[in-house]
Amino acid sequence: MAKVLCFLATNPQCVQPLREEVEMAIDEHGWTREGIAQMRRVDSFIKETLRFEGTTACVYFLRTPLMYLTSLLDGVQRKATKDVTLSDGTFLPRGTNVAFAVYAIEHDHHNYEDPFTFKPFRFVELQDKCGDPSKYQFASITHDSLGFGLGKSAW
């Protein structure tokens, strides 16, 4: 949440639309699941902040080429608790460390248009284009937006 507040402070033009959305949702639905579901801009702002800055510590301090390289190698890490064979035939013996380069995935131009630009309402625009307000929500997990993981291994 600290990153979200920092981005809100550095993007003051977003404060009013976010405030209006929250007030309208609460007036209409109160602090309920339905009310929170109406806060699409808030959801998009949070998701875009985490996409742009990442959820790993190194990404936040990207200032040098070495730190950039480190962030590409850093990401979601897990250790295989048993022998695993992946769908492509790759064998991972028990104890193998596996990592996903979250920053690289979330800044790939194949996954996001203009990935190095912070667009606070990027995901609202994507929802409007596809016509599905539940798609691209922060809580949804896709190959290009890992959020906090999935299942019992979620952060």
Model regions: which residues?
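Short, hydrophobic/aromatic alpha-helical segments in well-folded domains
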Residues: 1-5, 45, 101, 149-150
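Central I-helix of cytochrome P450 enzymes
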Residues: 1-23, 49
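Active-site proximal loops enriched in glycine and acidic residues that flank catalytic Cys/His/Asp
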Residues: 61-64, 69, 80, 101-104, ...
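Conserved cytochrome P450 K-helix/beta-meander segment immediately N-terminal to the heme-binding cysteine loop
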Residues: 100-136, 148
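Active/binding-pocket-proximal capping segment
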Residues: 21-25, 65-66, 81-82, 113-125
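Conserved cytochrome P450 K-helix E-x-x-R motif and the immediately C-terminal K′/meander segment
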Residues: 28-90, 96
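Structural signal for hydrophobic/aromatic residues that build the beta-strand cores
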Residues: 18, 22, 49, 92-98, ...
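Cytochrome P450 heme-iron axial ligand motif
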Residues: 137-155
